[in-house]
Amino acid sequence: MTYTTRQIGAKNTLEYKVYIEKDGKPVSAFHDIPLYADKENNIFNMVVEIPRWTNAKLEITKEETLNPIIQDTKKGKLRFVRNCFPHHGYIHNYGAFPQTWEDPNVSHPETKAVGDNDPIDVLEIGETIAYTGQVKQVKALGIMALLDEGETDWKVIAIDINDPLAPKLNDIEDVEKYFPGLLRATNEWFRIYKIPDGKPENQFAFSGEAKNKKYALDIIKETHDSWKQLIAGKSSDSKGIDLTNVTLPDTPTYSKAASDAIPPASPKADAPIDKSIDKWFFISGSV
């Protein structure tokens, strides 16, 4: 199944949006793209939000119809991740699994913290730099549990099935074998990346350990089941998430006409980023 993107506005502006299209029609990045590309073999569709080594904090918006990817803001200003030495921007292709939801109404029994109200995050570790709105087919290798400001924020470690090393990577121990140091660097980056913005160091459940593939698959299924309750209108509190979709006629928020209401593509050249975003931050004890 092939997906394309529809860009509106210039990257690095408040107007920037990327919709995902199927057969030229916008679909919801949150609800319409199937979680499973191949359920029998546990191959998942991943929606790429942030390409590796970039700084703009892009995410699937929860509040807008068909959930385009936009740049996050704080107090009306665009958000960028700072460069924490020796890293530059995000250290992986960063995105999410569609049709998943980390339920903020439920506390996880092992992390003792509620979900973060987002689709589950995915860190794709392959060699190719992805692009915003790309739908990759990946396999899950393991999972980490970030505790972000009191919420459980799962991070699935995955690899594009077309990556040259994908056949050799089948569980979390293979990551350390073929990508030595990557899991340690991932743990470090998530611990420190908010410090330059004046926030405390993040914490991890399980002492920062990356759990194995089986554990990851169980968590992915849990978040998929939570999404099923959400899209069916059965969640105790949907937290204002826009549930409009164009492919799920049995749901109360199905609207085939929603695609036609989306503006046509109007891409513009990337807007310049303030030079201050290039700064490197040196954090004690981070290397």
UniProtKB/Swiss-Prot annotation:
Pfam families: Pyrophosphatase. The modification Phosphothreonine is found at residues 65, 251. Its main location: cytoplasm. Present with 68400 molecules/cell in log phase SD medium. It is found in: Cytoplasm. PANTHER family: INORGANIC PYROPHOSPHATASE. This is Inorganic pyrophosphatase. GO terms for cellular component: cytoplasm; nucleus. It comes from the Eukaryota. It catalyses: diphosphate + H2O = 2 phosphate + H(+). Its EC number is 3.6.1.1. Homodimer. The modification Phosphoserine is found at residues 266, 286. GO terms for molecular function: inorganic diphosphate phosphatase activity; magnesium ion binding. InterPro entries: Pyrophosphatase, Pyrophosphatase_sf. Diphosphate binds at residue 79. There is a cross-link at residues 239, 279 (Glycyl lysine isopeptide (Lys-Gly) (interchain with G-Cter in ubiquitin)). CDD domains: pyrophosphatase. The active site is at residue 90. Belongs to the PPase family. Gene3D superfamilies: Inorganic pyrophosphatase. Signal peptide: none annotated.
